[in-house]
Amino acid sequence: MRLTKEQKVTSNQLESDRERYSAYLRSLPFTINLGSHLVVHAGVRPGVPLRRQMVTDLTEIRTMGANPSSRRGLPWYKVYRGRRIVVFGHWPSKAPRLAPRAIGLDTGCVYGGRLTGYIIESNQFVSVPARRAYAAPKR
């Protein structure tokens, strides 16, 4: 695997604590169930029960079809009709992505955009500008 310049810098910064951070990250769940909402990194495969989701669905999915990591195709959240509202990231846009049963929060902070959060109780977004761009946008 080849690391980008930014990834190499991060890797060097974390080297002394690599095992501690790795153990911590491995201990985290792939989903956070908040009752009415489900928090995931990337999304869920519509029609597949949560217990049968593949790790790659939860961490990489963007669209339906042969290459779910692709930015081209039908977005999973436009098809999803599950019981819980899915709060997800992994797909940067200028504003949160809103669908009937999904909320996308990735507003490109790593690329110099904004860091956005969502307050479930009041159905409100909170957003602050990034301090800087940490990586170049992917094309």
Annotate the PLM regions:
Residues H37-G43, G104-L105:
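Active-site-proximal beta-strand elements of phosphoester/diester hydrolases
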Residues M1-L38, P46, R52-R72:
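Active-site neighborhood of divalent metal-dependent phosphoester bond hydrolases
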